[in-house]
């Protein structure tokens, strides 16, 4: 029952990539609306997969000390957000103009994602994170 919203999000991703549906957004200059809805749907649909992967890699945050959560909490949520962003850029490349600025944002996001992922899995020190980012 808890998976129904994620399944609906996955169906939305499939539906948004049907050429007839995707074509609705192009002539009306709604490409950014398409990107927003697709990115949200992809990210939401990927979240259970990322949570499962985090548990398998033991990339979890244990409760205790100053932490407010009372259960083991999977890390790596940034992976779902990054994958949603990257997949949308790939899926909507025919609708978007890839300026130098957008390429710079994509490169910067990739670097920050890589450092965040390594931190979630291996627990990097604050100094290493600061230097890398």
Regions found by a protein language model. Name each.
Residues 1-133:
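"…together with the soluble PPM/PP2C metallo-phosphatase catalytic core" -> "…together
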